[in-house]
Regions:
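Flexible coil/turn and secondary-structure edge motifs
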Residues: 1-185
């Protein structure tokens, strides 16, 4: 399976000196578009993560019975874009206080998550959550419900979903943030 825009193989290994992270912030179509446009992002793909079932389908994930989340895997060059920059995009692109939904998209598969493969990334992600929580509270929002944990699996979604908004520019995207900017250090 190839990336619709870059033509890279979606099964590619992460290049040496590059890093990866998985974000869930609602429907994966809009979330992926937020990240594929960034300088320093080498490859994006959409998939399912967090549940126990091996290689689930979209239909079974949407049933809410597998505990999987619709996610975007982001492989990036940390010499060009930092994890802090990616986290800023993540926090600002959705409302992390909504629990098991994002806007009109309702269900556990739309919950806010960050899945990591590095303790260093985990610490930076947790710190960014605290920073953004303070900003949200100043603007009347409740607690962030984002799950931050080590990645246990990642299954590519069906080709139809990969880079969906590049293939379907007028396709549905219910992604919407809080309007609160991530504070600059």
């Amino acid at each position: 399976m190839k990336h619709f825009l870059s033509n890279l193989d979606l099964h590619s290994e992460t290049p040496q000196d590059y890093e990866s992270i998985i974000f869930g912030a609602g429907c994966f179509w809009g979330v992926e578009k937020k990240f594929w446009q960034l300088d320093g992002v080498w490859l994006t793909s959409v998939g399912y993560s967090g549940g126990e079932l091996e290689d689930p389908s979209y239909e079974i994930v949407c049933s809410g019975t597998t505990d999987h989340v619709e996610v975007v895997k982001v492989i990036f060059n940390p010499e060009v874009i930092s994890l802090a920059d990616l986290l800023k995009v993540f926090w600002e692109c959705h409302d992390p206080t909504q629990g098991m939904r994002q806007g009109n998209d309702i269900g556990s598969q739309y919950r806010s998550v960050i899945f990591l493969n590095s303790e260093l990334h985990k610490n930076e992600s947790l710190s960014s959550l605290e920073t953004y929580q303070d900003e949200l509270e100043l603007n009347g929002y409740g607690p962030i419900t984002t799950e931050i944990s080590m990645m246990k699996n990642y299954f590519l979604a069906e080709e139809y979903h990969q880079q969906y908004l590049a293939k379907n520019p007028n396709g549905y995207c219910g992604l919407g943030g809080t309007g609160c900017s991530f504070p600059n250090n």
